[in-house]
């Protein structure tokens, strides 16, 4: 089996004061210009050795170039990012209950950045390169589709951050057709790039301060979900309950509260966590018509300047009600 694809994006965004604007104090107009180009390509190759045991090997190759030239008044941020990724995977089933998946991967990132953070500063440059080879193994136990246990372990070596190990586990219990329960736990790491991820903040008049000791982000995350399929009036009422918790051990914090004249990118010094609870109900009242209601409660807090506070711009409550209708032939859906 072979797959390949390419993708290209070219975008130009402008904003700020219009060209017809004439300032009375002789100051130049403020404008924003963001030009983006992105090119992607990938290939997927797979070969099946044994169909009965689903023994197969697969190779995935992908690459991308992301180029952005951004101007926010006097402030400038230009970046060229090259990414290359390769993954070799092997899967097999020992029997109907036990299976194994393992593989090797290689990821390459190269950020070539130039920026000017104030009209009084010279244009600066930075080059960030990271090569990350890694390997993983994953074991799955499946007991008659009623109990499924999946455990995995991944190890990577970063040319910038060193070695890190990522464990992960999933459990699914489905004793009958009406109820199933899922649980998961694991660890995650992420490399941070302060300006590449947050250059929109340059539109502010605040001074940008980036601490030199920013480290890789590290967090534990846990989740549990339950699904009920309840027969009701010859139809099925679907109920879903979900809860997820993330505990950050290391994190890049964007602090805009400690100093009203600064945007400070700093390392987490204290607690940072996220609690998310969601409930959802869906019911087909008549043929083609389905009504869905959902409610989400989010509690996200981070330590800013030694004080644990709610993270800004994260809605605590969210509700959603949707109605969907599909015509009898399935051609139209509203």
Spans of features found by a protein language model:
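Residue-level signature of outer-membrane beta-barrel architecture
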Residues: 47-49, 88-94, 141, 155, ...
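Gram-negative outer-membrane beta-barrel transporters
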Residues: 142-144, 239, 243-247, 265-334
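Repeated loop/turn-to-beta-strand initiation elements of outer-membrane beta-barrel proteins
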Residues: 2, 12, 50-57, 96-100, ...
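Flexible loop and strand-edge segments within Gram-negative outer membrane beta-barrel domains
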Residues: 1-57, 63-81
């Amino acid at each position: 089996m072979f797959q390949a694809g390419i993708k290209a994006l070219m975008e130009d965004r402008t904003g700020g004061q219009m060209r017809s604007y004439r300032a009375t104090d002789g100051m130049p107009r403020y404008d924003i210009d963001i030009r983006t180009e992105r090119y992607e390509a990938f290939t997927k190759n797979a070969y099946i050795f044994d169909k009965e045991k689903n023994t197969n090997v697969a190779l995935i190759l992908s690459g991308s170039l992301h180029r952005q030239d951004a101007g926010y008044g006097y402030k400038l941020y230009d970046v060229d990012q090259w990414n290359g990724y390769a993954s070799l995977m092997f899967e097999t089933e020992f029997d109907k209950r036990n299976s194994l998946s393992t593989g090797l991967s290689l990821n390459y990132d190269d950020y070539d950045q130039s920026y000017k953070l104030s009209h009084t500063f010279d244009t600066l440059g930075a080059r960030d390169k990271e090569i990350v080879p890694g390997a993983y193994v994953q074991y799955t136990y499946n007991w008659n589709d009623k109990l499924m246990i999946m455990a995995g372990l991944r190890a990577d070596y970063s040319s910038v951050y060193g070695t890190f190990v990522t464990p992960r586990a999933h459990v699914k219990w489905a004793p009958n057709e009406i109820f199933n329960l899922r649980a998961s736990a694991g660890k995650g790491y992420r490399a941070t790039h302060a300006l590449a991820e947050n250059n929109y903040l340059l539109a502010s008049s605040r001074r940008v301060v980036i601490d030199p000791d920013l480290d890789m982000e590290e967090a534990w995350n846990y989740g549990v979900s339950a699904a009920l399929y309840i027969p009701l009036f010859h139809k099925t009422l679907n109920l879903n309950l979900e809860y997820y918790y993330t505990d950050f051990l290391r994190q890049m914090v964007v602090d805009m509260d400690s100093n009203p004249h600064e945007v400070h990118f700093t390392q987490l010094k204290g607690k940072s966590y996220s609690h998310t609870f969601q409930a959802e109900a869906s019911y087909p009242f008549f043929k083609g018509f389905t009504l869905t209601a959902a409610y989400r409660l989010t509690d996200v807090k981070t330590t800013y300047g030694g004080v644990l506070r709610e993270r800004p711009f994260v809605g605590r409550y969210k509700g959603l009600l949707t109605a969907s209708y599909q015509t009898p032939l399935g051609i139209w859906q509203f």
